[in-house]
Design a protein with these regions (language model features):
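Outer-membrane beta-barrel translocator domains and adjoining extracellular loop/strand segments
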Residues: 53-59, 99-102, 156-159, 200-207, ...
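Transmembrane beta-strand segments of Gram-negative outer membrane beta-barrel proteins
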Residues: 33-54, 116, 120, 138-149, ...
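Outer membrane beta-barrel
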Residues: 84-148, 175-188, 347
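Surface-exposed extracellular loop regions of Gram-negative outer-membrane beta-barrel proteins
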Residues: 35-86, 219-311, 368, 375, ...
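Outer-membrane beta-barrel proteins
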Residues: 19-34, 79-83, 122-132, 177, ...
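Acidic/polar low-complexity flexible segments
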Residues: 1-41
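Exposed, low-structure sequence patches enriched in small/polar residues
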Residues: 171-173, 179, 258, 269-458
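Outer-membrane beta-barrel transmembrane strands
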Residues: 139, 144-181, 318, 329
Length: 458
C-alpha cells in the first residue's frame, strides 16, 4: 500500500532479518509440470551509419560519415533445468547504454558498471570480491567483465602528416558461458572468450600501413561454490587466466600472461545472526622486462619511490607475484550490528588484466557498529545510526590513512526524513600523491553532511 508505505507478504520477513532467501515460503503440491528445455538461437545483422565533424586533410574523417555492416549469432541452451549455456559469435553491443562522460584527474582507472546482457546474467557466481563496502576498494574483484571487449591498449605511432583510424573497442570473436546451480547446492560459472587482434589503419600520405593496438587474447574464468548444512557453510574457489599473442611493440608494456585464483569460506552461526568470511587470492603476471617494469612503476604500487624501503624496483624482472585477502566477522541481525574486517593486498599483487583494483601494498582494518530501530514511537517511524574506525597502512609499516566515519538517518511519521554523516581524518603520509615521488604529508580534515527529504508520496 504505497500511501502508507506498507507491504503484504505471504511469508512475513522481519525487518531485522539477516537475509531474505532462507526465510521465504515453500510451495508444495505442483506436480506433472515438465519444464521446457531452452534452445534459443538468434542471428543478427546490423547496418551502422556514423556522422561526425569533417576534418580537412584527414582521409578518415574528411567525409563526415562512416558506414559499417556487421553480423553474428547469439544462442542460449538449457543443459539442465538449473544449468544454462550462453554462446555468442561476434556479439552486438550497439544497443547497450553508453557509459557516462567522466573527467578523471586521478592516477586510477575509472570503474564502469557492466551493461552487456551476456555478462550480466549469472554475474553473481563469477564474482570474487576482495574489497569492502562502496568506497574505493569496494569494486576490487578478480573478474571485471569490462576487460573483455575493452578499448584497445595501444595507440598508433604517428609521424608528422600521418593520420590514423583506430578502433574504439576490441571485437569479441566468440564467447561461451556456463552458469547455474545444481540441486545439491553446487554453483558453477565458467566463461571463455576470444578477442580479436585489432589494428590501427594509418595513412602516411603515400600509402596505408597497419599497426597492432590490441593482440589476439584468450580469457578464461572459472568459479565454483558449494553450499553445506542448509546454506550455513559455503566453500568456493576461482581461477582466471589471460593469455596474449604479443608483438614486440605491445610486449613492451603488456603482460604476456596473467593468472589469478582464490579460495573463499563463509560460515553462518546462530540462525545466520553471525557470519564469518575469509577470502584468499593470489596473482602472477609475466612478460618482458619492459612490461614488468611498467607494472612496478604503475599507480598501484610505485616501487620506484625514493623513500620506499620495503620493496625494490628490479628492471630485470620478468614476472611478479602477490596475494590478497579479506577476513570478516559480522553480526547482522537485531537492533545492534557489528563488523570487524581486515583486507590486505601485498605489493606484488596485480589483478588488472582480467580483474579490477586500484592499489596494492596496503592493509585496511575496520571496526564498524550500528544501531537500528524499526518500531514507531513519538515523532519517528524508524531511525538508524552507525560509525566505523579505520586504519590503513602499507607493508613497510607507514600509516597511510586513519580516521572515523559516521552516518545516521531518521524517518518521521509524516513521511519526511533527515540524515547526517561525516568523516574525521587525521594527518597522514600519502605514497601516491606525487605519483612515484617521495611520500608527502596530507593534513587532517573534517567533513560534514546533512539533508532532509519531504514526503516522497507527493
Amino acid at each position: 500500500l504505497y500511501r502508507h508505505n506498507e507491504q503484504a507478504f505471504w511469508q512475513a520477513i522481519p525487518r531485522n532479518a539477516p537475509g531474505v532467501i532462507h526465510l521465504m515460503g515453500e510451495l508444495y503440491g505442483l506436480d506433472e509440470i515438465k519444464p521446457r528445455k531452452i534452445l534459443d538461437v538468434t542471428p543478427y545483422g546490423v547496418a551502422q551509419a556514423e556522422t561526425f565533424k569533417k576534418e580537412a586533410g584527414n582521409p578518415f574523417r574528411e567525409d563526415g560519415r562512416k558506414y559499417k555492416l556487421n553480423g553474428g549469432i547469439d544462442a542460449k541452451i538449457g543443459i539442465t533445468n538449473n544449468m544454462t549455456m550462453d554462446l555468442t559469435i561476434n556479439p552486438d553491443f550497439g544497443q547497450v547504454e553508453a557509459d557516462p562522460s567522466v573527467v578523471n584527474l586521478t592516477a586510477y582507472e575509472t570503474y564502469f558498471s557492466e551493461k552487456r546482457p551476456f555478462f550480466i546474467e549469472g554475474k553473481n557466481i563469477t564474482s570474487f570480491n576482495i574489497g569492502l563496502g562502496d568506497g574505493d576498494s569496494g569494486n576490487d574483484n578478480l573478474f571485471y567483465s569490462r576487460r573483455i571487449g575493452r578499448n584497445p591498449h595501444g595507440h598508433a605511432d604517428l609521424e608528422d602528416g600521418w593520420y590514423a583510424d583506430r578502433p574504439n573497442f576490441t571485437t569479441i570473436l566468440g564467447a561461451a558461458k556456463l552458469t547455474g546451480k545444481t540441486k545439491n547446492g553446487l554453483s558453477l560459472g565458467f566463461i571463455e572468450a576470444i578477442t580479436a587482434e585489432e589494428k590501427a589503419e594509418i595513412d602516411t600520405g603515400g600509402g596505408r600501413i597497419y599497426q597492432t593496438v590490441e593482440p589476439l587474447t584468450s580469457y578464461l574464468i572459472g568459479r565454483v561454490q558449494k553450499d553445506f548444512k542448509e546454506g550455513n557453510t559455503l566453500l568456493g574457489g576461482m581461477f582466471t587466466s589471460t593469455n596474449r599473442d604479443l608483438d614486440q611493440n605491445l610486449g613492451s608494456f603488456m603482460h604476456k600472461s596473467a593468472y589469478t585464483g582464490g579460495l573463499d569460506f563463509t560460515q553462518y552461526f546462530n540462525k545466520k545472526n553471525w557470519m564469518f568470511n575469509i577470502n584468499l587470492a593470489f596473482s602472477q603476471v609475466a612478460g618482458t622486462k619492459e612490461a614488468i617494469a611498467e607494472t612496478q612503476r604503475s599507480s598501484a604500487r610505485y616501487f620506484q619511490r625514493p623513500d620506499n624501503d620495503h620493496t625494490e624496483f628490479d628492471p630485470e624482472r620478468t614476472s611478479l607475484m602477490g596475494n590478497a585477502g579479506r577476513i570478516q566477522l559480522q553480526k547482522q541481525n537485531g537492533h545492534f550490528n557489528l563488523m570487524l574486517c581486515s583486507i590486505w593486498k601485498t605489493p606484488g599483487f596485480e589483478a588488472n588484466d582480467l580483474g579490477y583494483m586500484q592499489e596494492s601494498d596496503e592493509v585496511l582494518s575496520v571496526i564498524w557498529a550500528g544501531y537500528h530501530v524499526w518500531d514507531p514511537k513519538g515523532i519517528y517511524r524508524s531511525y538508524n545510526f552507525g560509525g566505523d574506525v579505520y586504519v590503513v597502512n602499507n607493508f613497510g609499516g607507514d600509516i597511510t590513512g586513519k580516521g572515523f566515519e559516521w552516518n545516521g538517518n531518521m524517518s518521521f511519521k509524516n513521511y519526511w526524513s533527515a540524515w547526517t554523516g561525516g568523516n574525521i581524518s587525521t594527518s597522514h603520509p600519502s605514497t601516491g600523491l606525487l605519483r612515484g615521488g617521495p611520500m608527502m604529508e596530507i593534513p587532517g580534515n573534517i567533513s560534514l553532511r546533512a539533508g532532509f527529504q519531504t514526503d516522497y508520496r507527493k
